[in-house]
């Protein structure tokens, strides 16, 4: 194979981005190129004309930011002994963290799969795109012999150029690096279990928080998609990730090395969490975008059994089962929308009609929305109690819930963030609400209920209005206990 040079990408968010040869080799695989055909914001591209960016460019952005942060820590704190292998592993994890997304991104794992599981009374809810990313990463390494490329990569192995390193020892180190990368992609593990990580020791536990931070949500994945999504949605982004990179330090907190930030960056971090809330409120949970995604999901459910995707060993898979075979899953992208739309199979007729309505903007009509603290089960019971207008049935109405928060449900996310002061940069501290401001929100989570009517016209307006009023009235009087504040 020809020697691959570093490649410079002209990114609209980060400018000229140079990635090392090993990452270029990963980018030039079918498994990664698949991300060009998966929209970052799913059905919202039918609401916001500019929101057609994909998981491909987002993943390149995350790889770049992962490198920027870990290199800044290495330069600022040589005592951390961050190696070039560490840097490249973190960058590879950033590049590959979204390999497991299905058609229209979160629509597939957040709406389609749960709906299919309910229809099949399947209680297994363990599948998520992060676990699929790990499986796709394994598949990509195997299909493209990337472990061999890692062995040959001079930059990756510059610290191992020693006659004392045997081929078997090098293989073992690369095996450990691959496990490390997968742990970085999907770090669903408690602090107590961090000792069991095979990739890196406890002294480098902070590396697990760079790409996907399950502890407090501050990670380079969010930094990229906040900036990128705001850009393509045409929204302002007040959060400045560059300031955080400049102030980031690793300090010990309760026996664990964590990435901490200067105390004066607290309001920049609140801007970050508010940006998340605002993007969900204005875009990700947009009332029209949400119903378009529900309509696409309905079409996918109806078309599921008739989609045939060839996978490993000559087997065929459908929309749901393709996720269990990475060869088939590599072929499953947003293009399934057009596949359904252009299929002449009569079994696809209902699915085609739904997708056709989206293109003609004949969408389900939003009758209204209001805040709620009721659970999903309570909302279902309320819907069953609402008297239906004449000539309608329950399926004519869609009751949708949207949850909005700062990233830690009802909790203040800053409670999980560690800071340091200029006077003592090696001591991790927490900041209390009293030290911050009396103007911070008292509640960090809300739930919205939206009611839609599938078929509506001038004659149904009054009935639709009455249905919404009845639903809201029964909701407010429902005998079930409201959750505590």
Model-derived segments and spans:
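Sequence-structural signature of the catalytic-core scaffold of metal-dependent phosphohydrolases
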Residues: 1-92, 100-370
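Terminal helices and disordered tails flanking the catalytic cores of nucleotide-processing hydrolases
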Residues: 283, 288, 297, 307-485
């Amino acid at each position: 194979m020809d020697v691959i040079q570093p490649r410079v990408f002209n990114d609209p968010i980060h400018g000229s981005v140079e990635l090392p040869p090993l990452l270029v080799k990963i980018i030039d695989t079918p498994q990664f190129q698949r991300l060009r055909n998966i929209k970052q914001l799913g059905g919202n591209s039918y609401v916001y004309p500019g929101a057609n960016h994909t998981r491909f460019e987002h993943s390149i952005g995350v790889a770049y930011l992962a490198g920027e942060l870990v290199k800044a820590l290495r330069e600022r704190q040589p005592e951390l002994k961050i190696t070039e292998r560490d840097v490249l592993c973190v960058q590879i994890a950033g590049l590959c963290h979204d390999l497991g997304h299905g058609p229209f991104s979160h629509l597939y794992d957040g709406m389609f799969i749960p709906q299919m599981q309910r229809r099949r009374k399947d209680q297994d809810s363990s599948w998520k795109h992060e676990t699929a990313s790990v499986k796709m990463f394994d598949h990509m390494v195997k299909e493209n012999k990337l472990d061999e490329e890692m062995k040959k990569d001079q930059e990756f192995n510059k610290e191992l150029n020693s006659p004392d390193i045997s081929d078997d020892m090098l293989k073992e180190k690369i095996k450990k690096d691959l496990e490390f990368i997968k742990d970085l992609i999907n770090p669903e593990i408690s602090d107590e279990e961090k000792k069991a990580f095979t990739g890196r020791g406890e002294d480098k536990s902070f590396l697990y928080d760079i790409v996907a931070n399950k502890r407090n949500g501050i990670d380079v994945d969010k930094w990229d998609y906040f900036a990128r999504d705001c850009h393509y949605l045409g929204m302002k982004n007040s959060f400045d990730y560059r300031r955080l990179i400049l102030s980031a330090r690793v300090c010990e907190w309760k026996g664990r090395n964590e990435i901490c930030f200067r105390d004066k960056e607290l309001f920049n971090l609140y801007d970050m969490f508010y940006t998340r809330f605002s993007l969900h409120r204005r875009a990700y949970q947009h009332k029209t975008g949400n119903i378009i995604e529900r309509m696409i999901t309905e079409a996918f459910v109806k078309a599921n059994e008739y989609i045939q995707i060839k996978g490993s060993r000559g087997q065929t898979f459908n929309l749901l089962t393709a996720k269990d075979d990475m060869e088939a899953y590599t072929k499953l992208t947003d293009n399934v929308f057009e596949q359904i739309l252009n299929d002449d199979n009569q079994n696809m007729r209902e699915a085609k009609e739904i997708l056709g309505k989206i293109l003609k903007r004949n969408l389900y009509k939003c009758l209204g929305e209001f805040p709620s603290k009721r659970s999903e089960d309570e909302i279902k019971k309320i819907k069953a109690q609402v008297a239906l207008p004449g000539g309608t049935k329950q399926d004519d109405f869609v009751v949708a819930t949207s949850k909005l928060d700062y990233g830690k449900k009802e909790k203040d996310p800053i409670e999980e963030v560690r800071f340091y002061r200029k006077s003592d940069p090696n001591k991790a501290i927490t900041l209390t609400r009293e030290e911050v401001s009396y103007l911070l929100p008292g509640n960090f989570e809300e739930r919205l209920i939206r009611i839609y009517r599938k078929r509506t016209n001038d004659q149904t307006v009054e009935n639709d209005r009455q249905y919404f009023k009845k639903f809201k009235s029964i909701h407010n009087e429902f005998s079930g206990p409201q959750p505590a504040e």
